[in-house]
Every structure is written in structure tokens, then in C-alpha cells.
């Protein structure tokens, strides 16, 4: 009986493929296999032009043509460890335990081999992606899919650190993306400075290669006629000198004749001083002449000198500072003022001065007559 029971258990429960397995267990196992396959590495053929592949491409919302890497995938996910579903029944526990141990050992070896193969595939895929990125110059973007969270992100594929940190530069010299106003201003200034330096370098190289073809400054007037720069500068200097001369004449006109004469004499004295000897004695004729020409208010000999002998720089003392007077006869007036030298001899007064003098003369005459009459009596 025990042998029959052990044979029955081995035939019905210890077989890996039982003959009378229900459809429900088969469907469950198929679902688990499909799930493990979905969680593992997916290798898709980009060159597949079938209708199924086209439908998958059309259903994708993100129009991304780059390579796709799965993040968060380990080799153990490709082949999950299978637990033994065997049960020990009755007295055949030792046999069942031995069978379970052998099955678990076989499944563990298979899992290790599958994990090693998956790791090799992942390493080969990463190496191929890095090689493609290096050949493309490090500018290709790779879509990384995290299988644990389902998130996707675009990353640079194995490019140098200095190029990975730099954002794309637009045509105006600024970086693409959201930036502050100060950053954009600094980028524009840097672009302008770089363009200015480049232009100066190009001009310097051109001048060194062709020094005879240097640019000449051309000036034109409002009508478009060409103006010579040297003639324009000479005209500007002439106009400036003319303006200074007019300003000096205007200041000179504000001064009187006496001040101008004194200034002229002072200039002449300075010019003559260049030729004078350093020591001047009492016998110096020029010094004595200058001292004689000076007028002093307390000079005791001034009253004995004739007016013709007293001269001030070639002009007589009697005529110095006097205005010309009328030389002909003129009617008298009570103040003794003589008419000007331009008077034409016509008396245009109201006759008061003449009547006054007549009254004075009449009074004096009457006074003399009265005195004479008294003597006669």
C-alpha cells in the first residue's frame, strides 16, 4: 500500500507537467510569464515597417526619434525566481523534500544564468549608445524610461562635462531657455564685445597685409559735396582767430582814449627797456628828459616857465586838454560863457541877457547923471 501511495503521489503531484492541469492554472501561469516578460528588457527593431510597429509609433504622444534606455531595471527582473508549488502530503515528506530541493536548485541556476545574460546585454547596449553619442559629437539626446515609476526624461548621452553644462546658443548670442534679465543682458554684452574684438582683429590683419589701402575719412557738406579735411581745419582756425580779434576790439572800445594812450606808452617803454643799460646815472639824458616832462603841484619854478616851454610828450601845456572856442565877437552873458567854435553867429536866445545888460547900463548911467546934477545945484 505504501508503495502504491508513493507512486500515486509521484504521478499526480511530483510531476512538473501534470497531465490534468486546469485551464485556470494555465492562464495564470501565462499571465505571470507575460508580466515578467513585460518587466524585462525590450529590444525593438527600429527598421520594422510592419503595421503593428507603425500603430505603436502613431500611438506615442512624444515624437522622439532617439534611443530609449530603461532605468531602474536589474538583471533579476528578467527572470524572477520561481518558488516551488509542491506540497508534502502524508508519509512521502522525505521524497517530496528531496524533489523540492532539486527543483529549487535547478531554478536558481537558471536565474543566475539569465541574470548574467541580461547584464551582458545591458552593458553591450550602453557601450553601443556611448559609441553612437561620441560619433555624433556628444549632442544626441537619449530618452531614459524609468520602469519602476514610469517617468521619462531627456538626457545627454555620454558627452564631456564642459559641453553638457552649456545650453544651446541662439543667433543673437543668448542661451535658450528661461533666464533672468541680468543674465540675458550680460550675454548680449559679451556677444557685442566679442564681435567688436573680432572686427578689430580683422581690420588689423587687413591693414598689415594692405597698408596702402587704409580707409580715408571723407567729409561732405549738406549738399553732398566732398570737403577737404585740411582746408576745413584751416577755415576753423581762421574763424577762431577772427572771433578772438573781434572780442579784443570790443574790449578795447570800452576803454577811453587816455587808457589806450597809457597802454601804448607802457608798451613802448617796455620795448625801449630792452636796449637800456642796467645802470642809469644822473647824467642820463633820457632820464632827465622824462623827469622834466612831469608836472608837480608844488614845483616852485612852474610859475616862471613859459607855457611853450612846458611840454608833455610833444604837446604844449596851454593846449593840453582844452577844447577849441569861437574866435569872433559874441554877445555877453552873465556867466561869461563863450559860444562853441561851430557857432554860426546867430543869437537864438529870448533876449533876456541883452535886456539885463541894458538895465545895468541904464542904472549906472542914471547914477552918474544924478551925481552930476547934484553938483550943479
Curated annotation (Swiss-Prot):
One of its GO terms (cellular component) is cytoplasm. GO terms for biological process: mRNA splicing, via spliceosome. The keyword Cytoplasm applies. Residues 185-276 form a coiled coil. InterPro entries: Bud13, CWC26_splicing_factor. Keywords: Coiled coil, Cytoplasm, mRNA processing, mRNA splicing, Nucleus, Spliceosome. It is found in: Cytoplasm; Nucleus. It comes from the Eukaryota. Residues 1-47, 203-255, 293-341 are annotated as: Disordered. Pfam families: Bud13. The keyword Cytoplasm applies. Involved in pre-mRNA splicing. Associated with the spliceosome. Belongs to the CWC26 family. This is Pre-mRNA-splicing factor cwc-26. It comes from Neurospora crassa (strain ATCC 24698 / 74-OR23-1A / CBS 708.71 / DSM 1257 / FGSC 987). The gene is cwc-26.
Amino acid at each position: 500500500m505504501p508503495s502504491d501511495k508513493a507512486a500515486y503521489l509521484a504521478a499526480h503531484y511530483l510531476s512538473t507537467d501534470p497531465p490534468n492541469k486546469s485551464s485556470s492554472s494555465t492562464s495564470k501561469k501565462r499571465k505571470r510569464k507575460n508580466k515578467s516578460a513585460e518587466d524585462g528588457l525590450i529590444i525593438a527593431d527600429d527598421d520594422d515597417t510592419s503595421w503593428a510597429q507603425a500603430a505603436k509609433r502613431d500611438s506615442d504622444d512624444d515624437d522622439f526619434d532617439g534611443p530609449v534606455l530603461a532605468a531602474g531595471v536589474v538583471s533579476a527582473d528578467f527572470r524572477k525566481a520561481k518558488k516551488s508549488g509542491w506540497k508534502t502530503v502524508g508519509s512521502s515528506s522525505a521524497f517530496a523534500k528531496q524533489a523540492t530541493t532539486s527543483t529549487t536548485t535547478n531554478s536558481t541556476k537558471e536565474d543566475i544564468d539569465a541574470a548574467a545574460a541580461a547584464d551582458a546585454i545591458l552593458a553591450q547596449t550602453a557601450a553601443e549608445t556611448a559609441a553612437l553619442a561620441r560619433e555624433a559629437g556628444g549632442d544626441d539626446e537619449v530618452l531614459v524610461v524609468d520602469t519602476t515609476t514610469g517617468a521619462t526624461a531627456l538626457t545627454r548621452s555620454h558627452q564631456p562635462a564642459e559641453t553638457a553644462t552649456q545650453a544651446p546658443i541662439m543667433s543673437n548670442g543668448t542661451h535658450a531657455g528661461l533666464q533672468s534679465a541680468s543674465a540675458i543682458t550680460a550675454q548680449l554684452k559679451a556677444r557685442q564685445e566679442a564681435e567688436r574684438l573680432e572686427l578689430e582683429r580683422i581690420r588689423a590683419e587687413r591693414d598689415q597685409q594692405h597698408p596702402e589701402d587704409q580707409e580715408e575719412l571723407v567729409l561732405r557738406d549738406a549738399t553732398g559735396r566732398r570737403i577737404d579735411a585740411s582746408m576745413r581745419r584751416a577755415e576753423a582756425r581762421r574763424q577762431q582767430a577772427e572771433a578772438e580779434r573781434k572780442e579784443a576790439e570790443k574790449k578795447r572800445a570800452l576803454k577811453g582814449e587816455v587808457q589806450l594812450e597809457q597802454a601804448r606808452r607802457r608798451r613802448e617803454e617796455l620795448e625801449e627797456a630792452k636796449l637800456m643799460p642796467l645802470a642809469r646815472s644822473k647824467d642820463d639824458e633820457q632820464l632827465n628828459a622824462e623827469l622834466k616832462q612831469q608836472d608837480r603841484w608844488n614845483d616852485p619854478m612852474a610859475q616862471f616857465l613859459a607855457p611853450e616851454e612846458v611840454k608833455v610828450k610833444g604837446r604844449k601845456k596851454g593846449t593840453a586838454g582844452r577844447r577849441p572856442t569861437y574866435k569872433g565877437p559874441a554877445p555877453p552873458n552873465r556867466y561869461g560863457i563863450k559860444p562853441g567854435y561851430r557857432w554860426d553867429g546867430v543869437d537864438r536866445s529870448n533876449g533876456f541877457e541883452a535886456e539885463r545888460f541894458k538895465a545895468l547900463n541904464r542904472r549906472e548911467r542914471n547914477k552918474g547923471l544924478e551925481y552930476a546934477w547934484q553938483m550943479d545945484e
